[in-house]
A protein has these predicted regions:
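N-terminal alpha-helical transmembrane segments of multi-pass membrane transport
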Residues: 1-86, 96-103, 114, 409, ...
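Transmembrane helix-loop junctions in multi-pass membrane proteins
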Residues: 42-46, 88-92, 101, 170-181, ...
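Extracellular/periplasmic helix-exit of transmembrane alpha-helices
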Residues: 121-129, 133, 235-251, 259, ...
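Helix-loop-helix module between adjacent transmembrane segments
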Residues: 34-39, 110-135, 142, 146-179, ...
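Membrane-interface loop-to-helix entry segments
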Residues: 30-34, 38-54, 161, 178-185, ...
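Selective recognition of specific alpha-helical transmembrane segments in multi-pass small-molecule
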Residues: 113-121, 198-212, 223-243, 276, ...
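Alpha-helical membrane segments and immediately flanking helix-loop junctions
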Residues: 64-98, 124-127, 133-142, 146-148, ...
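Flexible loop linkers connecting adjacent transmembrane helices
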Residues: 44-72, 94-96, 100-104, 108, ...
Length: 501
């Protein structure tokens, strides 16, 4: 009983801290402001170049002449594996059950401006990446904050991020996800949580032994499949409730600014609650501004930071504008959002059951949760590993992988009432230093992005042309990635017009 009381008190304390971090005076304006600043300085690159980015990332897949540990497509699927997780199913339901349908609008908002933030952090991840003692590529906020902001403040931000990322990896990327897998298999198929723990331990451990190359191959194989299965199920539900779709959109846009009145088990929500829940669950879902995806992006085989930045920003589009929208519309059109916050965990399953039948609907959601959560564990294991290396050195790789794999067992076999509150707080602590860094380095991002896109607007330049461009612009990025700290103010000269053809 004392343990339950202590857990309840701890949850309340963490909840209070999280409400301040995610409140209207700190992360919400900082998230939106950073995305807006980058959107303006990059001249809406997420809208102008979305088609080009989708083609380059999903169709071209490989960047000829690029150096890195994994292909740019594998980097994208690794980042998608980490983001398309429980937040897309349970997180969306939680946001709507507390903030009302209007929360979905603000989740879209985090996605649209967040695409610019995602572009910026992926650009910087590649721009300032280094080669570690074992010959692997290492990058992310823990690197570019220190290298790009060349003073004590930059180092402070980098270390703050690294510590928060290691902690968050065990929360958002492990405990909550393993618990979701265990609960899903037990509820749908009656699998004993202890058996799930053993399966996860073996499966995760087998993949992590191979490092990022193994993670990239696994995620590239099953991430597209799991997303397609979920979307097809959602489309069928929407077809069966097609007449309710216009009213659902009207409710989403209206309630985003006016709040939602109490109805059924829903307690009602003011505008600020819809805004707060939309932003908090939005970043939990797409991780834009958190800096996590920059770690995966930095490992990609790419011939220029701009090219990988564009590919990486499609991750937020797929996650929020596609998958989150599907979940939200299914929940709103079937009216299950009125059940109330205490039913958030089963809302999506009930919504799918309303259109597909109880057996098929519940099975698709449960299987999706299992796959989404498993993939999230893989992606976040790499994020945490790279930040652990930043703190302790490359010797920490093996102990970290062992610890991360063991914690999966804890998550699968233990009730985790604190998990979501802890995950929200950890996400916020990661985002704070990264967002500050993105604002400070926004000039560098905008300057080099403009220079490259003026030279190669359709991303069709050959490796030789890009090499010449780097020489002409006095940019040693590809030939001397470990010396980027000394290069912050490039003088762009005449570009190679052949790339435009």
């Amino acid at each position: 009983m004392e343990e339950q009381t202590f857990a309840s008190r701890l949850n309340d304390i963490l909840g209070e801290i999280s409400s301040v971090v995610w409140g209207p005076y700190l992360l919400i304006p900082l998230l939106f402001g950073t995305g807006l600043i980058l959107t303006i300085r990059l001249r809406g690159v997420q809208f102008r170049k979305l088609g080009t980015a989708l083609r380059h990332g999903l169709l071209d897949r490989d960047d000829e002449g690029g150096k890195g540990d994994i292909s740019q497509y594998e980097a994208l699927t690794t980042a998608l594996a980490a983001t398309v997780g429980v937040g897309n199913i349970v997180g969306v339901a939680t946001a709507i059950s507390i903030g009302g349908p209007g929360a979905l609008f603000w989740m879209w908002g985090t996605g649209l401006v967040g695409m610019a933030s995602k572009y910026g952090e992926a650009f910087l991840g590649v721009r300032f990446r280094t080669t570690d003692a074992k010959g692997g590529i290492s990058g992310g906020p823990q690197r570019y904050l220190a290298a790009g902001i060349q003073n004590g403040f930059g180092k402070f931000l980098a270390w703050f991020f690294a510590i928060a990322a290691v902690i968050a990896a065990f929360g958002i990327g492990n405990l909550t996800q393993a618990n979701a897998v265990s609960a899903g298999l037990e509820d749908t198929f009656g699998v004993d949580p202890r058996l799930t723990a053993v399966i996860l331990f073996i499966g995760i451990g087998a993949v992590l032994v191979g490092g990022i190359k193994s993670i990239g191959k696994v995620t590239a194989a099953f991430v597209p499949m799991m997303i397609v299965i979920y979307l097809v199920g959602g489309i069928i539900v929407l077809i069966t409730h097609a007449g309710d779709i216009p009213a659902a959109f009207g409710m989403i846009f209206r309630d985003a600014f006016s709040g939602t009145a109490a109805t059924g088990g829903f307690l009602g929500a003011a505008f600020i609650i819809a805004l707060q829940m939309g932003f908090a669950r939005g970043i939990f879902s797409n991780e834009s501004g958190m800096g996590s995806a920059a770690v995966a992006a930095s490992a990609a085989k790419t011939s220029h930071p701009v090219r990988q930045g564009l590919v990486s920003m499609t991750q937020t589009f797929i996650d929020t504008i596609v998958v989150v929208t599907m979940t939200g519309l299914v929940i709103v059109t079937t009216d299950v959002w009125k059940l109330g916050p205490d039913q958030a965990g089963v809302m999506t399953a009930r919504a799918f059951s309303a259109g597909l039948g109880s057996d098929w609907g519940g099975m698709i959601v449960s299987v999706s949760v299992v796959f989404f959560a498993f993939s999230t564990i893989l992606g976040w294991s790499y994020y945490g590993e790279r930040n652990a290396e930043r703190i302790f050195g490359t010797w920490a790789t093996t102990p970290y992988r062992m610890a991360f794999t063991c914690v999966v067992v804890v998550g699968a076999t233990t009730e985790l009432d604190l998990a979501w509150t802890f995950a929200d707080l950890a996400n916020g602590l990661m985002a704070l230093p990264n967002l500050v860094g993105l604002i400070i380095l926004s000039g560098l991002i905008a300057r080099e992005t403009k220079a490259y896109l003026d030279f190669d607007p359709k991303l069709k330049a050959s490796p030789d042309q890009i090499d010449q461009f780097l020489i002409d612009s006095n940019n040693p990025w590809r030939t001397a990635p470990n010396k980027m700290e000394a290069y912050l103010t490039p003088k762009t000269k005449t570009t190679n017009s052949e790339a435009k053809n």
